[in-house]
Structures are given as C-alpha cells and as structure tokens.
C-alpha cells in the first residue's frame, strides 16, 4: 500500500479543481491555481543536496509553503534541515489507508442524524461554517473552498462535500476527493461539533464517503489522522502506514 501511495498520490498526483501539479527531479509540488500557496508532497533528497533544494523551495514560494514530510522520507535528518530553513512543524498526523472492500459498509447513522452530499453553493457555505466552528476561522484555504464549488458543476465530481445533519442543524462536515487514474480516494475534514462527539457521527460521515468512493470504483481510502480520530478509523479497518508532519512557512 505504501509503495502505491508514494507513487500515485505523492510522486505523480493528479490535478484537481484549483490545484496544479509540478513534477521535478527532486520534488513534486502542488500549487494553488490562484498562486496563494504551494506544497511539497514528495521529495527524494540526500544529505548532499537537501539544504539546497529546501532553500530553493522557500525562495520560490509566493504565498504560504507547506512541506509534507513523511517518516520514511530521506535523509534521516530532514526535519532538522527544514527547521534550520525556517519552517515550523504542525502536529504529527498518521497516514491511514483502508482497502474499501474490507470496510463494513454501510455504517449506521446515529438516531436523528442523516448524512447527505452537498449539491449547491449553500451547502458549501454550510460546510465552511462547520469547519470554522470546529477547527477555527480560516482552517480551510479559500482555494479549497473554490475547488469544492467548482466540482459541483463537473461530472463526475472530483470532490464531494458531505454534511451530517441533526434536524436542520449541520453538526459535522467533511469531503472526499477522487483521484482519477489512481487507486485512491482521500478523506479531508470530518470535524464534528463538540456537543455531538462520541455518538457515532464521525463514523457515519466516514462511511458515507467510503460508499461514494466504492461506488466510483476506487480500491483504497486514505486519510491523515489526528490522535483523536485514529482509533476510530483503525476500528473501522484503516491501517497505519507512516507518520506525516506538515512543515509550514509563510512569507514576510
């Protein structure tokens, strides 16, 4: 699984709404089409060239820069080199992957809760409101929001946003991205309002998106999990493959 993930999702990822791909000899980066951000998602560096490549990425970044570091990325002291270049680490996440055929689907929704795909701009706005409340304002980059809006008019959709509702109140939100030409779909978001945590809402939201990926013919489902969600996902059948740390740098 890890070899397939590295090749399909990191070395040669597919572009999506609002996201461009730039493949070079030592790095692969994703770039926001509005130029406001870039991210190094794959690298193959050595002790001899790492500092030079890192410095070049920092220098070329017009907007915010993220270096998506995985625990198996060489050289072994790459975290120290990123820190020396002025980048700062975010909390460590766990790369989890599930074979969709092994998941127990469908996942039962909690009583009084329904999960639905977003079909209009109002739904996208609601998704953003939930994320802002759960993760803090500005947690979802504007280019990502625009990508979800753009996907509404595409067939098949490269991104599906999903909301969990309790009556007329949106209580959780997430999205699933379909990486056509690969074996992978990926999960993002998944934030649930504090008063609804521990009731199975997160599992239902994962299950809904897993069914969408299954119905589109994808083999694997991938997510970068925080400590709170990791045990839930592992209980559903996801397997840890690596640790990953976003290293961030913003221009002055």
Segment roles from a protein language model:
Residues 139-195:
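A conserved beta-strand-loop-helix scaffold within acyl/acetyltransferase catalytic domains
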Residues 34-45, 70, 183-194:
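Conserved acetyl-CoA binding element of GNAT-fold acetyltransferases
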Residues 20-24, 74-88, 158-174:
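Conserved beta-hairpin
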Residues 49-58, 189-194, 198-211, 215, ...:
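Conserved acetyl-CoA-binding loop-helix of GNAT-fold acetyltransferases
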Residues 74-89, 203, 215, 227-244:
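Conserved active-site alpha-helix within GNAT-family acetyltransferase domains
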Residues 1-60, 74-75:
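N-terminal charged segments
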Residues 62-64, 130-142:
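Helix-loop element at the rim of GNAT/NAT acetyltransferase active sites that forms part
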Residues 47-122, 223, 245-249:
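Acyl-donor-binding surface of acyltransferase catalytic domains
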